[in-house]
Amino acid sequence: MRKPVIAGNWKLFKTKNEALALIEELAPLVSGVDSVEIVVAPVFTVLPTLPAALAGTGISLAAQDVFWEEEGAFTGEVSPRMLLDAGASHVIIGHSERRQYFGETEETVNKKVKAALKGALVPIVCIGETLEAREAGDTFKVLERQLKGGLEGLTGTQFAPVIVAYEPVWAIGTGKVASDDQAQEAHAFIRGVIAGLFGKSAADKVRILYGGSVKPDNVKGLMSRPDIDGALVGGASLKGASFASIVRYSE
């Protein structure tokens, strides 16, 4: 049985005090939820201030990106060791906004995934097609390329902790949502690619999250599908009540 993951990507929102206020609001609302793994991903500057606030809440801490070198002359970058030091246990890698605005490629995703795993962080590896790719009928081709490129060179044992997030780029921050059927079709395909890469057992165990305008009113339908194991939530994770409602989707 795959334990669902609900991860909140705060993107470029929330100062230290705003983040602490959000955790203060969120923590009691998700208290006692043991059936779901809860993760929040603040900006780098906020990471070190949250572990104390999250203690005893069952909420894990993720970074929104990582660099593949441990240290060196890489201005502006943060290494896996430094993220661990700041209290993170997870890291989002290859988010569509990183690909769109900052030149992220399959090659850099692959380096980051390997570095994160070596540094004992759980990678949340994001893949997804643009509207152009979907309309051209290239969804599966894009997903397979991104998956194989991002996970290249990993053994089945190394892959085991990895979480995959499917985020159709056309549904991020647009208010458009992939239908439950569209999302399930993509997730089933992703699981099939993983089976080809690492075997059926690995594919059966990997958690595949859906990301793309997830809200309290659509999460239940998405989570009812057999290959959807959670959500990577953007805007709706910035308010305690809406994020808690998503976390408690099964109630």
Curated annotation (Swiss-Prot):
Enzyme Commission number(s) of this protein: 5.3.1.1
Entry-linked PROSITE patterns: TIM_1, TIM_2
Residue positions of the active site: H95 (electrophile), E167 (proton acceptor)
Top-level lineage group: Bacteria
Annotated keywords: Cytoplasm, Gluconeogenesis, Glycolysis, Isomerase
Pathway linked to the protein: Carbohydrate biosynthesis; gluconeogenesis; Carbohydrate degradation; glycolysis; D-glyceraldehyde 3-phosphate from glycerone phosphate: step 1/1
Record's GO cellular component terms: cytosol
Quaternary structure (record): Homodimer.
Name of the protein in its database record: Triosephosphate isomerase
Organism expressing this protein natively: Citrifermentans bemidjiense (strain ATCC BAA-1014 / DSM 16622 / JCM 12645 / Bem) (Geobacter bemidjiensis)
